Amino acid sequence: MSSKFHSSIPLNAKQIYSRDLKWLDGSKLMIAEVSGPSLGVGFEIAYALFHKKIPVLAVYHEKADQISSMIHGCNDKKLTIKKYNDLDDLVNNIKTFISNNGGN
């Protein structure tokens, strides 16, 4: 989990917005890491839940100070929130979520 994603082509804000929504538009579910604050991730979760109406798994590390109250307080049935303590726990949460939502 220490590797970082870097685009080989620099993108501006509009390009990032379009790319990310295109990814969500082509998705059957969403997995979001929410251990730290991110307006962008919150926007993507809301888009997935309320526009695309697809299931979302929001995962956070047990040592996270706190997750967003907007995420934690959301009672949408398509939103699953799971805490993890290590990589194996994270992978198991993801596998279970995918299996429960029609994945392989």
Report the location of each language-model feature:
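Conserved catalytic or regulatory cores that recognize and/or transform ribose-phosphate-containing ligands
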Residues: 1-104
